[in-house]
A protein has these predicted regions:
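Acidic, polar ligand-binding/catalytic clefts
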Residues: 75-137
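Immediate post-signal peptide segment of exported/extracytoplasmic ligand-binding proteins
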Residues: 2, 6-9, 13-57, 70, ...
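Ligand-binding cleft/hinge of the Venus flytrap
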Residues: 49-53, 65-73, 150-169, 173-174
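Short, hydrophobic beta-strand segments that form beta-sheet elements in well-ordered domains
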Residues: 126, 141-146
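Extracytoplasmic small-molecule ligand-binding "clamshell" domains
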Residues: 30-101
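Short, polar loop motifs at secondary-structure junctions
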Residues: 130-131, 147-153
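Loop/turn elements at helix/coil->beta-strand transitions in domains of secreted/extracellular proteins
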Residues: 73-76, 94-95, 140-141, 161-162, ...
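Short helix-initiation/N-cap motifs at beta->coil->alpha
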Residues: 62, 78-89, 130, 164-180
Length: 181
């Protein structure tokens, strides 16, 4: 069993936002009515993105981007991919990304963002019997986080911790449950 510790997640980044990235705006705009827009997501952030019973990406973000496509008269396909590859795939593999993603200066140099439509906070999940209550309690510990996420960036900034990254968030949780982080 695990519990969430909000105190252990204190950081200089107070806000995160889910945002649609669209660096390939010119190419996407060139697609005529009836065309297909391909968006990437990382379906590991319910209720915003998850894999539905049919094996396809589902959730609020998927419904939102499909509604945008309908308004534009275009079909929208949503591909489930690794979170860390979303930004780099825009413009070649996908037309845009829709995912719970923090807007950072580094990302803004690579892609354009919509206005954020949801603000989230970062949490640290610890075992139920843990005595970790503050960021200081994380010294000399190993923190697991998903590659390319705000959680990864924050864990790298905490003095005295070892940051362990994972392609999928569930793998970090599994290692926590099994005592590896």
């Amino acid at each position: 069993a695990t519990k969430e510790s909000t105190q252990a997640a204190e950081s200089s980044v107070a806000e995160t936002a889910a945002a649609t990235t669209e660096a390939a705006a010119t190419e996407a705009a060139d697609k005529t009515e009836g065309g297909v827009l391909v968006f990437g997501t990382n379906a590991e952030f319910p209720p915003f993105e998850y894999v539905g019973d049919d094996g396809e990406p589902d959730g609020f973000d998927v419904a939102l981007i499909k509604a945008v496509g309908e308004k534009l008269g275009m079909e929208v396909q949503v591909e489930n991919m690794e979170f860390d590859s979303l930004v780099s795939s825009i413009g070649n593999r996908i037309d845009g990304a829709i995912a719970g993603m923090t807007v950072t200066d580094e990302r803004k140099e690579q892609v354009d963002f919509s206005d954020p439509y949801y603000e989230a906070v970062q949490f640290v999940i610890v075992p139920a019997d843990s005595n970790i209550a503050t960021a200081d309690d994380l010294k000399n510990k190993t923190i697991g986080s998903q590659l390319g996420t705000t959680g990864m960036f924050l864990s790298e900034d905490i003095e005295g911790v070892t940051a362990q990254t994972y392609n999928r968030a569930i793998d970090a949780v599994n290692d926590l449950v099994n005592g590896r982080v």
